[in-house]
Amino acid sequence: METYGLEKLGLVNAGAVYRNLTPAQLVEHALRRGEGTLSNTGALVVKTGKYTGRSANDKFIVDTPAVHDDIAWGKVNRPFEKAKFDAIRAKVLAYLQGRDVFIFDGFAGADSKYTKAFRIVNELASQNLFIHQLLRRPTAEQLRDFHEDYTIIAAPGFKCVPDIDGTRSEAAILVDYEAREVVICGTQYAGEIKKSVFSVMNYVLPKQGVFPMHCSANIGKNGDSAVFFGLSGTGKTTLSADPQRMLIGDDEHGWADDSVFNFEGGCYAKCINLSPEGEPEIYNAIRFGALVENVVMDPDTREFDFDDASLAVNSRVGYPVEYIPNAELSGMSPSVPKTVIFLTADAYGVLPPISKLNRDQAMYYFVSGFTSKVAGTEIGVTEPVPTFSTCFGEPFLPLDPSVYAAMLAEKVEKAGARVYLVNTGWNGTGKRMKLSYTRAMVTAALTGDIEKGEFVTDPTFGVQVPTSIEGVPSELLIPANTWEDKAAYEASCRKLAQSFAENFKKYTHMSAAVVAAGPKA
């Protein structure tokens, strides 16, 4: 039986070994093995059990001399002993002995100058389907000559024993940059595999002069590209799926000297409250070949109830970018971005729904990475919680924030890009901003129409706020207008401004000009 080189990993006695099966074959295997069921649209539907989001506290980086000085150690990048990693790795390989395994050999990085080859070894056919659709798929010729740069082993059925293994729980995501391996066990949430690829790219690309970004990206009809930064649940996927523009990708990109390129070949979209009216591109992508996680489905009709959050608020669907009608299949833009948008979901209700930033403000708000944790994207988050995530992607950034901030500054300046802060969160009415209004504001920024009107300076945040945008009620553009209680509004402004200032104290490397660009408490 062909083993496709698994013995190099130490996996010498697997059951059947399948490599780069088609989606149809993987769906057949998943159904036969009882991993999921089919929906009335043909999508494969699975329940991931206990873990329905990323388990951020269970991720560790192996601390070796070769990488020690590179990593920004702390609450996000937790060190793990090499010997303990090797012990868990050996146990996982022993666990996989005699079991069928599914291999996907593919790529991250659409720009061939920066492409990395990944081998993903899965215990589950459904997870292999997911990563087949999310990464960049090889041609027959590429598969024949394939040599992996990195290997990820995902064995959800293997549970760690914290007292013995040195982990925090039964789940662990262990990244060994020096050995070029990742081991994922105890969690079936497929997003862990995708984000492990992202963490690797965030480590290696800055060394090649490429700025790795937790962002979505699209291209206008004139070839003008735009990038949208933001944490999970702030609207990256939704706002970049624009019928008037070509989608490059929805989550992970690199900004090189002459292009923006997608790391992936697929999308991973939230499903909660999904509707054909609100997000038709995503809704219509839920078909055969897509993997749906934790969406409630009628057992008889097999119809979805996207409004039912009883399985998870963070319900998801993974599908290839080809399922989006206006996708840019090359995964690249012909030019560097002219528009940069920072997305945030402000639970305080005081940030303007859209504002323009100068260079120092762009640095300040990028490094701050303010948003509110939105229910369900991490274990234990059920209500919006104001939070700061460095560079809008702290959980995935192994290097010091100053590395990524300096790269953004350099790229924005070189491209002459305009930077906007867009609040997709709440206002003084206690309601979240309507998607149609946010779309109108983003469109005005992308077309340049926003620059034709007047701007006023926000007294607390110092940003430039437009006074009118077509398709948006003017009273919503100025946050104070949405609050009946002006004293409460001002108190909330002060509270958020103080949070910004307190958070920014840890960035001792930033210039005085950037520090001064923050809100006035």
Sequence positions of predicted segments:
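Generic C-terminus detector
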Residues: 476, 481-521
